[in-house]
Amino acid sequence: PVMFVTEDTTRSNPDEIRAIYSRALELGADRICVCDTCGHATPHGTKQLLHFIQDEVIPDAGFRRRDIEVNWHGHQDRGLGVANNLAAVESGADVIHGTALGVGERAGNAPLDQTLVNLSLMGVIKNDLTQLKAYTQMAHDCIEVALPRNYPVFGKDAFETGTGVHASAVIKAMKKGNEWL
C-alpha cells in the first residue's frame, strides 16, 4: 500500500489538486490523504473538497472510488477540527486522523477523544467508550498538556450545572444510560 499525502490541500487550487492526485494514482498510490494543514477548512468546505476528490478526481483518473482509500487530516486553528472530522465522515472519508487531546503544532490537531464521542452520539460507531475518560487522563499525564476544567466532555466542569433546567437534562441523560457522558 502506498499513501500519497498532500500538504495544505484545503488552500490549493482545484486544478492542481486534480493533477497531483491523478498522477499519484497513476504511479501506484492506493491511498490519499487530504490535509487541512493550517486548519483553514470549514465543515462545508471539507465536504465540498472530499466530494470533488471522490466524485471527480478519482474517477477521472480512471479509478473506482472504492479502490482508493481517502484519509482526512485536520487541524484546530479555527476550532473546527472535530466538526471537520465529522463532515469528512459524512462525506465518505475512509479514515480520519486525530490526536490525544488535540495535541499538535500551533492550535493542534483534531482531538481524537472528542471526535470519538461525537461519532458515537451520531450512531456512526458503536465502540465501547467507557475507558475514554481514563485515556484522556493518561494522555494528559503522559504528555503533560493541560486539561482545562471546561474541556469538552472530559474537563472537570464539562457537565457541572448551576440551574435547575440544566440539572434536569443531566439527570435525564443519566437515566437513558449515558452515565459515561
Language-model-derived ranges and their functions:
Residues 5-7, 35, 71-75, 96-101, ...:
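Generic beta-strand/beta-sheet core signal
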Residues 38, 76, 101-102, 157-163:
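Glycine-rich beta-alpha junction loops
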Residues 104-132:
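C-terminal helical cap(s) of enzyme catalytic domains, especially alpha/beta-barrels
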Residues 34-37, 87-109:
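Glycine-rich phosphate-binding active-site loops on the catalytic face of alpha/beta enzymes
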Residues 78-83:
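Short glycine/serine/threonine-rich phosphate/pyrophosphate-binding segments
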Residues 1-70, 86-91:
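Alpha/beta enzyme core
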Residues 125-181:
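A mid-to-C-terminal "edge-of-domain" accessory segment
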